[in-house]
Design a protein with these regions (language model features):
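A polyanion-binding, active-site-adjacent surface
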Residues: 1-172
Length: 172
């Protein structure tokens, strides 16, 4: 495997005090954790109420992993703007995603779905489920999005097995 430096994703590290107000407000609510989950709709789920089906699937995965309390954190790659002129518009902010990952003390990111993985900086051709790499000094795992898991429920078990194997391999 190439050294981690060769697999960096370009972003400008932004200090939390320079983040837009909506990102600062969310950061104040998010707890630190070694394992960070992200998906395209996460910002919406955190700020406007979680989609029940996504919440059910995510809870099932997290519970099945049997990680100690305080392991998981959730940090979005997208967040809807909160200013009147931008109401409802969702944009991805790679710089704020990776700055947040650093701020939260994350060692491993689980990116659910192609859209989120591309938003955080993976080249489209590198995005595939049940794959891992080292990017920006953290382990980045890509898995299916919620729609793909719902299409084939056995994928949920595949995600759990893959992540548990990663934990063992990396001693996390």
């Amino acid at each position: 495997m190439p050294p981690a430096a060769a697999l960096s994703i370009s972003f400008t590290r932004t200090a939390p005090e320079d983040w837009p107000a909506s990102w600062q407000k969310l950061r104040a609510r998010v707890k630190r954790g070694r394992l960070c989950w992200t998906y395209w709709e996460l910002g919406q789920d955190l700020c406007r109420g979680a989609d029940p089906e996504r919440l059910r699937v995510l809870a099932q995965i997290v519970t099945s992993l049997h990680r100690p309390a305080g392991t998981n954190t959730f940090w979005p790659c997208t967040l809807a703007a909160l200013t009147d002129g931008e109401q409802g518009r969702t944009a991805f902010r790679r710089d704020l995603f990776w700055s947040g990952v650093r701020e939260l003390g994350v060692r491993m990111v689980v990116s659910m779905g192609d859209q989120a993985s591309i938003a955080i900086g993976l080249p489209k051709e590198a995005v595939q489920p049940l794959h891992w790499d080292i990017r920006n000094g953290v382990i980045l795992c890509t898995v299916w999005d919620f729609v793909r898991i719902a299409e084939q429920p056995s994928r949920l078990d595949d995600v759990v097995v893959f992540l548990n194997n990663m934990f063992r391999l990396l001693r996390l």
